[in-house]
Regions:
Chain A
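Active-site-lining helix/loop region of Rossmann-like oxidoreductase modules
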Residues: 150, 161-227
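Rossmann-fold NAD(P)-dependent oxidoreductase module
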Residues: 23, 27, 133, 180
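Rossmann-fold NAD(P)-binding glycine/threonine-rich loop
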Residues: 97, 105-156
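Short beta->alpha connector loops
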Residues: 80-83, 146-147, 170-171
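Rossmann-like NAD(P)-binding element
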Residues: 55-102, 106-114
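A short helix-to-beta-strand connector/capping loop
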Residues: 54-61, 135-138, 187
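NAD(P)+-binding Rossmann beta1-loop-alpha1 motif at the extreme N-terminus of oxidoreductases
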Residues: 2-51
Length: 227, 227
């Protein structure tokens, strides 16, 4: 059940047609929301395939980045980190104005092979770059520290005893994202502070990648235990 | 109880007289080992204070970095990241040759205020710099992802249901460090691979620092949950 700070059904934009985008899109449809999947072109093959599979819902739509951002009351950035600023520029600052913009991206640089490095320093983050470039959007960094299946079904693992991290400058926007996370099944959500905390969750990615290797599965997550 | 791959009593060098160094030194004394705390000068005030408090054991010693490294069969680097290479140079490559060198340091740069940034990129780590500079030492990165009290008494928190991470190029050295961790009470130890994985655990520090703020205590740690 979606709690009070989120309307029971809302319009969501998902920018990006990869696994993260379609996984979140499907979860939102399952919860009764309307979803537009946005990509660079209207005839993106992955978007059309997703739309075909989701047509029965009557609430699945496809369009350009700009179409989707105009459609959504809340916007998810699910593009690759290296494409994020450009994709959001195509979405259009005007279409993002005043909206909660959930940034799931990571500043991964795959150009030098595996494991990828980060294209940000520890004094910078993609979350901050997004907030700076789209100053009137209410950016919340979230969903960037676990694999796609766990993002939307956290209770699959350890009965949900693991943690989601959020950060952002807008307290009301973070409350909405917390509500959304709870509607996905998240029990443990840690608010790390303002958008500069994106440095922290993005810099966790090198450890996430090594743990992926050590665990031999992407179905793992971390639980913060405290006294 | 220390298991088969570690002798029941051994000689340890601790380089660095801060909280991490003295906390580990006291734990090693409590387990019956001999310990020399090394610092830049023989008359370091913190080292002498520690020695006074530990004299009853008959197994506590102080000396220069070089004295300690010569004394220890296993060497702990517990100096600040910014001082690590210089401290190890003073310890002397010859005194480190063939020895297990446990590197607990983090590449934190406090010069621009709090929170500290990292002075390494995601394609580099202090662990690798140490291994490269002291090629005949058997470097194992460990103990750099939790607060000092938890390093030596992990069962204080959540009955020890949280994780220590190690990495290094020498399998036998990592086995010795795993034995040592178990003798300290660690139940969950994840081997992340070769020394390049130090990039991962060192890059976790920005998240550790934000979690410290969010948890309002340093008595927290992370547990990796997996399917």
């Amino acid at each position: 059940m979606v709690d009070a700070t989120l309307a029971s059904t809302m319009k969501f934009a998902i920018l990006g047609t990869g696994t993260v985008g379609t996984t979140i899109a499907n979860k939102l449809l399952a919860l009764g929301h309307d979803v537009m999947l946005g990509s660079r072109t209207k005839d993106n093959a992955k978007a059309l395939e997703w739309h075909k599979g989701s047509a029965a819902s009557g609430r699945a739509h496809v369009g350009t980045f700009a179409d989707a951002a105009a459609f959504g009351e809340v916007v998810f950035n699910c593009t690759l980190g290296s494409a994020t600023i450009e994709a959001l520029s195509l979405a259009g600052a005007g279409n993002l104005e005043g909206k909660v913009l959930i940034d799931t991206s990571n500043p991964l640089d795959f150009s030098k092979g595996m494991p990828p490095s980060l294209f940000t320093s520890s004094e910078d983050s993609l979350g901050e770059r997004v907030q700076k470039a789209f100053a009137s959007a209410r950016v919340v960094k979230a969903f960037n520290t676990m694999s796609a299946p766990l993002m939307v079904e956290p209770q699959q693992l350890a009965d949900g005893q693991h943690d989601a991290f959020i950060c952002g400058n807008d307290a009301a926007a973070k409350e909405q994202v917390q509500s959304l996370l709870r509607s996905f099944g998240w029990k443990h959500i840690i608010d790390l502070g303002d958008i500069t905390a994106a440095r922290a969750t993005e810099h966790y990615l090198p450890l996430w990648l090594r743990l992926w290797g050590a665990c031999k599965t992407h179905m793992f997550s971390v639980h913060v235990v405290r006294s």
